[in-house]
Each structure stands twice: as structure tokens, then as C-alpha cells.
């Protein structure tokens, strides 16, 4: 059954999708379109044919001076996109504007302060975790906040782990220098009894990342200032033993990461980091049962698959549209 609700929802971009947050926004667009909602990409930056084509089959609307919006149109805008917040504030006909804040620590790129957010004609905020909601409210944001957790695609799943050469997956995008520090400590402490291959997933497509993780025994995390930690969840879904930085500034207030699903190290604990990876290699080679891996897999299946995401999309956007999406079929 299609709903065919008579409104337009625009997800704002300034370039090709390339980050985890970008891909989450595209998941929102696809799911809303499955529900019969006219959701599109609003491209406000680089508008070359190559960039337009990077969104695949999703409809792209080019933002220019000729396009007109109604007061019922809805803009979904990332927290960092100051140009869109400023532009919308100056429009004669002001669309409904909703922030999709996927990282509270980058909110300063879009707004000067929490007070600036509260005073803006922004209607409400969507976030990917209760941690993000907590961090925004902690600093004084009073706008209504809804949570839609992203999902981990089913192609993130365990495969046969390579044993002749033990694969260790990582991304150095956020902590490039610290990977080099870690590797020095690791090579200084490792027994070198088993061959090890470090595989950098930075720059790979999401499907390529899934393949690397599925074959990797260990994922070493160089997360920093996370709102949820999507890459860590992908590694859990792939059956990796996750070791490293959680990415949370105050880990005790997050809803996902604890010692039952991985081994987490504090800032500067490079010796401990290397020791934990060395131990994990020995445990893997010896076939030791690892409850952290099983707990991580269980966490993903219970909370972060597409069925959970679609339920939250229906609930949150149904409230925004004032329409019962939860009892509709996609």
C-alpha cells in the first residue's frame, strides 16, 4: 500500500555521499520512498553531473534561485550545514526545517551556540542515539529531539576467518597518527609467532568494507568523538573481536558500548592496546571461545538491523507528518 502523502521532503547535500552519516541520510530517503513519501535529495553545493549521478536512482533536486518551496515542504539538514540554515531563515516562504544531527560535537559548524539553535525557526532534531540526545541536552539545546538508530545491512556478516595470515581491519581516517603509534607498540610487544596483515578500510565502498571485515579476526578501532560508532557496529556484525578506542567522550553515558562486546582502551594507553591485540591473536589462533564476539553479534541482531530502523522511521516521521505510517505497508 502506498501512502502518497502530499508533501515534499528534501534531504540536503552539498557534495557526493561519502561518509557514514551521508549513507544514513540516503537510508532515510529510500525508506521514506518505500512508504510512498516524496523524499528527494536537495543538492546545494557542487552540482556537476558526476555529483548528481553519485546518488544513483534517487531523485535529485538542484537548489537554485528559481526553485520555489512551500511552507509544508520539509528540509532535513545535517548539523554542519550552516549555509542551508542561513538561507532558509531568509526565505520569504519558510519550509519546515528539521536538523539531522549525527554528531553533536560538529554542531558548532552549523550554529554558534545552543542558544542559537533554540532561537532558530528549526522545528525539531533527529539523532542516531540516546547519547547524541544526551550530549545536546547537556549543553542546553531545548528543541524536541527524536531518535532513529541507523541499521547495519545484512551483508555485514561473519565469513570464514583467515588463519594462515591473520587479518586485522582498521581505519586510520580519524586518528591517523595514533595508528602509527599503536603499530610501533604492537610490533615491539608481539611475539611474531603468527603472520598478521593490517588492512586499512579507509576509502573502500561499504560493500568492500563488509568483505574485509567478514574475513578479519580483529577490528582495531581508532574512533574519535562518535555519536554512535557505526564502524564499530559493522565490525561486530562481521564477527570481529573489536579492540581500541570507543570514540565516546564519556563512555558511561552511551547506550551500546561496554566491556561485554569489546575491549576498550583510554587515551594514551598504547601499551595496553597492543597487549590486548596480542592476546586476541593468540586466543583466535588457539580457537578460544570469545563471548565478546557472540555478544556483539547478538546486539546487532536485536537492535541494529533494517526492521528496527524501519520501525523507528515510521514512528518518528509519522509524528512529523501527522500520519500513521506504523500501520502502513512498505
UniProtKB/Swiss-Prot annotation:
A GO CC annotation given for this chain: cytoplasm
Keyword field: Cytoplasm, Glycosyltransferase, Transferase
Subcellular location, record wording: Cytoplasm
Biochemical pathway: Protein modification; protein glycosylation
Main subcellular location: cytoplasm
Keyword Transferase: yes
Class of this enzyme: transferase
EC number: 2.4.1.-
Keyword Cytoplasm: yes
GO biological process: protein N-linked glycosylation via asparagine
GO MF, one example: UDP-glucosyltransferase activity
Cofactor note (record): Does not require a metal cofactor.
Function: Catalyzes the transfer of a glucose moiety from UDP-glucose to another glucose that is N-linked to an asparagine within a peptide or protein. Can act in a repetitive manner, and this way it elongates the N-linked glucose by a glycan chain consisting of several alpha-1->6 linked glucose residues. Is able to add up to six glucose units in vitro. Cannot use UDP-Gal, UDP-GlcNAc or UDP-GalNAc as a substrate donor.
Entry similarity comment: Belongs to the glycosyltransferase group 1 family.
Protein name (record): Alpha-1,6-glucosyltransferase
Natural source organism: Actinobacillus pleuropneumoniae serotype 7 (strain AP76)
Amino acid at each position: 500500500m502506498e501512502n502518497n502523502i502530499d508533501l515534499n521532503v528534501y534531504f540536503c547535500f552539498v557534495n557526493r555521499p561519502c561518509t557514514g552519516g551521508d549513507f544514513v541520510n540516503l537510508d532515510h530517503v529510500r525508506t521514506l520512498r518505500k512508504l510512498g513519501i516524496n523524499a528527494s535529495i536537495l543538492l546545494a553545493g557542487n552540482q556537476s553531473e558526476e555529483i548528481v549521478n553519485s546518488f544513483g536512482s534517487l531523485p535529485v533536486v538542484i537548489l537554485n534561485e528559481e526553485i520555489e518551496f512551500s511552507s509544508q515542504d520539509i528540509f532535513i539538514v545535517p548539523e554542519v550545514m550552516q549555509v542551508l540554515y542561513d538561507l532558509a531563515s531568509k526565505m520569504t516562504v519558510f519550509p519546515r526545517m528539521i536538523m539531522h544531527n549525527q554528531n553533536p560535537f560538529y554542531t558548532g559548524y552549523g550554529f554558534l551556540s545552543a542558544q542559537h539553535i533554540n532561537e532558530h525557526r528549526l522545528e525539531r532534531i533527529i539523532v542516531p542515539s540516546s547519547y547524541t540526545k544526551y550530549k545536546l541536552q547537556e549543553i542546553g539545546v531545548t528543541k524536541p529531539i527524536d531518535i532513529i538508530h541507523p541499521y547495519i545491512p545484512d551483508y555485514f556478516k561473519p565469513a570464514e576467518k583467515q588463519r594462515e595470515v591473520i587479518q586485522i581491519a582498521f581505519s586510520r581516517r580519524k586518528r591517523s597518527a595514533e595508528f602509527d603509534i599503536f603499530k610501533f607498540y604492537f610490533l615491539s610487544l608481539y611475539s611474531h609467532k603468527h603472520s598478521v596483515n593490517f588492512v586499512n578500510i579507509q576509502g573502500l565502498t561499504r560493500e568492500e568494507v563488509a568483505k574485509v571485515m567478514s574475513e578479519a579476526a580483529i577490528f582495531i578501532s581508532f574512533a574519535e568523538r562518535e555519536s554512535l560508532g557505526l564502524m564499530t557496529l559493522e565490525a561486530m556484525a562481521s564477527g570481529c573481536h573489536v579492540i581500541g578506542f570507543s570514540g565516546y567522550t564519556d563512555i558511561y553515558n552511551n547506550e551500546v558500548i561496554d566491556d561485554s562486546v569489546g575491549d576498550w582502551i583510554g587515551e594514551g594507553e598504547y601499551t595496553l592496546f597492543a597487549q590486548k591485540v596480542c592476546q586476541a591473536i593468540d586466543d583466535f589462533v588457539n580457537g578460544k571461545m570469545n563471548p565478546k564476539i557472540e555478544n556483539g553479534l547478538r546486539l546487532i541482531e536485536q537492535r541494529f538491523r533494517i526492521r528496527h530502523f524501519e520501525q523507528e522511521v515510521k514512528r518518528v516521521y509519522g509524528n512529523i507528518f501527522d500520519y500513521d505510517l506504523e500501520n502502513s505497508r512498505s
